[in-house]
Amino acid sequence: MSITKDDILNAVAEMSVMEVVALIEAMEEKFGVSAAAAVVAGGAEGGAAAAEQTEFDVMMTSFGENKVKVIKALRGATGLGLKEAKAMAESAPVAVKEAITKEEAEALKTDLEEAGASVEIK
């Protein structure tokens, strides 16, 4: 009996963020590909599309001076365990959360910056 796409999707859905990152890196290495999104050159309509952005990514660029507070903030925001949150903080720059609303992104950015991290919203 072979493994179906649904079996794989269910297994990935149960993984932590750090496990998914490790899986992606292993797949990139095994198949010689990159998971980076292709950049498409936009014409005059590109500005209108950017103005209508509804999903945002929160990127932590540095954990700053107080790593412990940042790890606590990461755990609270993502639900990660201590080990995973520490690994995420130490692997900056890293996407903390992706495809979230502007309000969620702003709140997360505020929480992380109050803890001492450097954060960008993309």
From Swiss-Prot:
GO molecular function: mRNA binding; structural constituent of ribosome
Top-rank taxon: Bacteria
Keywords, comma-separated and alphabetical: Ribonucleoprotein, Ribosomal protein
Gene Ontology CC terms, in alphabetical order: cytosolic large ribosomal subunit
Gene Ontology process terms (BP): translation
Cross-referenced InterPro entries: Ribosomal_bL12, Ribosomal_bL12_C, Ribosomal_bL12_C/ClpS-like, Ribosomal_bL12_oligo, Ribosomal_bL12_oligo_N_sf
Family statement drawn from the similarity comment of this UniProt entry: Belongs to the bacterial ribosomal protein bL12 family.
Subunit structure: Homodimer. Part of the ribosomal stalk of the 50S ribosomal subunit. Forms a multimeric L10(L12)X complex, where L10 forms an elongated spine to which 2 to 4 L12 dimers bind in a sequential fashion. Binds GTP-bound translation factors.
Database matches in NCBIfam families: L12
Function: Forms part of the ribosomal stalk which helps the ribosome interact with GTP-bound translation factors. Is thus essential for accurate translation.
Protein name in UniProt: Large ribosomal subunit protein bL12
Gene name, Swiss-Prot/TrEMBL: rplL
